Amino acid sequence: MQRRIMGIETEFGITCTFHGQRRLSPDEVARYLFRRVVSWGRSSNVFLRNGSRLYLDVGSHPEYATAECDELPVLIAHDKAGERILQDLVVDAETRLAEEGIGGDIYLFKNNTDSAGNSYGCHENFLIARGGEFAKIADGLIPFLVTRQLIAGAGKVLQSPRGASYCLSQRADHIWEGVSSATTRSRPIINTRDEPHADAERYRRLHVIVGDSNMSETTTLLKVGTAALVLEMIESGVPMRDFTFENPIRAIREISHDTTGRKAVRLAGGGDISALDAQTEYYEKAAAFVANRGTDPVTHQVLDLWRRTLEAVQTQDFTKVDTEIDWIIKKKLIDAYAAKHGLDLTHPRIAQLDLTYHDVRPGRGLHSLLAARGRAARVVTDGQITTAMTVPPQTTRARLRGEFVAAAQDAGRDYTVDWVHLKLNDQAQRTVLLKDPFRSTDDRVTKLIEAM
């Protein structure tokens, strides 16, 4: 896999069931969740020792943004570390609630929709060169992203006036534009707001907001890995057929509602194509591209899972990937439960099952239970995730940020940090600007730490 700075931002759903008479609003529950963070960070928007950012987003949604990663397994470990960091906050908040006489269980969900129909996102970030034609890259990537849900969707039981049906994606029905500078109002596929968090003369950040939040480590590997490969092909000028859809927003919904992948979707230039055929062509192009430029173990793993997932959809024999792809894992679970208990998809217990798959609490969330029983495949170990909770990626700028935050906290020093700045809030107001996200060592940061 080409070395590239990548990151994942995840907004979590939160709710609380109360045991006593007193009730709290979602806003109040979220504030309890972040009380420990505010006590040491004096804010609900902080950077952690592992280089990540943790904050309370609009609408009472806790959000975790991984540190800059340049390898997929490291990114997956840091994405999973975010779940555990927030789960630790949940345990702390439940203890505080109990101490104050407000008995309650807090539920944190790594999903994309709530029961009221609200949607919250999972955003992928890829660093690209400033010199490239952004519009060309975005236009080339959108058809891939529209069809990618076939291999990387989280799955959802969609309730409608016509009944209930199983869909590929949680996010698809909440996307309203192809490209836009807004993320909450219009919910585009690619966000065009130009915030590189790096040297603006050299870099730009590609901000993809169409993807689902994945519980499965292997699905995250496939989701991000395939996007990185297609992006690399576009940047390298690999000729690809024009799959621009006549209406990308209608296309993303039609594809989500068809688990066979065979729904023909209209193309802007005339004719049509199915998600299965489009993804198969992307896969074949990527396999040829990698064969020509050379492979590595991670790229091989991505291509192998991509091929096997497409074969599973083609044959509708999902046993080849039913521990590796979120929407398939969940569908197998729901189908088995519904058949055992004689339920249809409209039954409330099916909705509960759908939601509980995304509960991040170990031993309660269904995905974590499946993983513990070997029925959900892994990419990284529990030890790697535990390490990622406190140790930043060692080959990117995140290492400098994480080491600075740790040193300042240990020394009891007042400091300010963002993605590119490290600042000691003392009389000298010493500040270091880190414009190169690939750089993991810097004498200026070493001196700043030594001066504490």
Swiss-Prot record:
<dbReference type="GO" id="GO:0016879">
    <property type="term" value="F:ligase activity, forming carbon-nitrogen bonds"/>
</dbReference>
<dbReference type="Pfam" id="PF03136">
    <property type="entry name" value="Pup_ligase"/>
</dbReference>
<keyword id="KW-0067">ATP-binding</keyword>
<feature type="binding site">
    <location>
        <position position="9"/>
    </location>
    <ligand>
        <name>Mg(2+)</name>
    </ligand>
</feature>
<comment type="similarity">
    <text>Belongs to the Pup ligase/Pup deamidase family. Pup-conjugating enzyme subfamily.</text>
</comment>
<dbReference type="GO" id="GO:0010498">
    <property type="term" value="P:proteasomal protein catabolic process"/>
</dbReference>
<dbReference type="GO" id="GO:0070490">
    <property type="term" value="P:protein pupylation"/>
</dbReference>
<dbReference type="GO" id="GO:0000287">
    <property type="term" value="F:magnesium ion binding"/>
</dbReference>
<keyword id="KW-0436">Ligase</keyword>
<keyword id="KW-0547">Nucleotide-binding</keyword>
<keyword id="KW-0479">Metal-binding</keyword>
<comment type="function">
    <text>Catalyzes the covalent attachment of the prokaryotic ubiquitin-like protein modifier Pup to the proteasomal substrate proteins, thereby targeting them for proteasomal degradation. This tagging system is termed pupylation. The ligation reaction involves the side-chain carboxylate of the C-terminal glutamate of Pup and the side-chain amino group of a substrate lysine.</text>
</comment>
<dbReference type="InterPro" id="IPR004347">
    <property type="entry name" value="Pup_ligase/deamidase"/>
</dbReference>
<feature type="binding site">
    <location>
        <position position="55"/>
    </location>
    <ligand>
        <name>Mg(2+)</name>
    </ligand>
</feature>
<feature type="binding site">
    <location>
        <position position="53"/>
    </location>
    <ligand>
        <name>ATP</name>
    </ligand>
</feature>
<dbReference type="GO" id="GO:0005524">
    <property type="term" value="F:ATP binding"/>
</dbReference>
<dbReference type="InterPro" id="IPR022279">
    <property type="entry name" value="Pup_ligase"/>
</dbReference>
<keyword id="KW-0460">Magnesium</keyword>
<dbReference type="GO" id="GO:0019787">
    <property type="term" value="F:ubiquitin-like protein transferase activity"/>
</dbReference>
<protein>
    <recommendedName>
        <fullName>Pup--protein ligase</fullName>
        <ecNumber>6.3.1.19</ecNumber>
    </recommendedName>
</protein>
<feature type="active site" description="Proton acceptor">
    <location>
        <position position="57"/>
    </location>
</feature>
<comment type="pathway">
    <text>Protein degradation; proteasomal Pup-dependent pathway.</text>
</comment>
<dbReference type="GO" id="GO:0019941">
    <property type="term" value="P:modification-dependent protein catabolic process"/>
</dbReference>
<comment type="pathway">
    <text>Protein modification; protein pupylation.</text>
</comment>
<feature type="binding site">
    <location>
        <position position="66"/>
    </location>
    <ligand>
        <name>ATP</name>
    </ligand>
</feature>
<feature type="binding site">
    <location>
        <position position="419"/>
    </location>
    <ligand>
        <name>ATP</name>
    </ligand>
</feature>
<keyword id="KW-0833">Ubl conjugation pathway</keyword>
<feature type="binding site">
    <location>
        <position position="63"/>
    </location>
    <ligand>
        <name>Mg(2+)</name>
    </ligand>
</feature>
